[in-house]
């Protein structure tokens, strides 16, 4: 980590006395970066217009969900860190709150994606705040999408030889099925 950051080992150890502290800091930073990218997708000027069209709404949902998957080298590196944090939290209870935050972030992304699929721009903010969607069926659909995202997340990391485009295709097919119910 020190070499990658261009710091000496002593400098890193000054700021982070344990590996868990460093892992927790990195996880928080990645979470903030992902939230900023998602806010950029939602805040884009064309989202309001895009949701008016069925195919564009699907594209918005796809872009949101791709943030939770190892679809390129940057996302893969981030997802590997999250997986390490999740695995470590099984032995270190102090890390479990961060894993809970990660779970909430993926659920929030799923809620926003469902809001996009349903073309409900008024629900995007609700989903983004971590609140349940105002419709029970939509909230259940978000829970289902969350499960799909977790499965694709693990497949992408466990089977790195799998083409990221195949992950996208599986995600797109799942989103289309959810939309067309």
Where are the regions that the model predicts?
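Secondary-structure edge/capping motif, primarily at the C-terminal ends of alpha-helices
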Residues: 45, 89, 156-159
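Amphipathic alpha-helical segments used for helix-helix packing
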Residues: 60, 73-97
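Short alpha-helical scaffolding segments that buttress acidic/His motifs in well-ordered protein cores
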Residues: 64-68, 82-86, 145, 149-152
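Helix-turn-helix
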Residues: 1-25, 29
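Hydrophobic alpha-helical connector segments
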Residues: 39-77, 127, 131-133, 142-145
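Hydrophobic/aromatic-rich alpha-helical bundle segments in the mid-to-C-terminal region
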Residues: 95-100, 104, 117-181
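Hydrophobic/aromatic residues within well-ordered alpha-helical segments
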Residues: 19, 26, 30, 34, ...
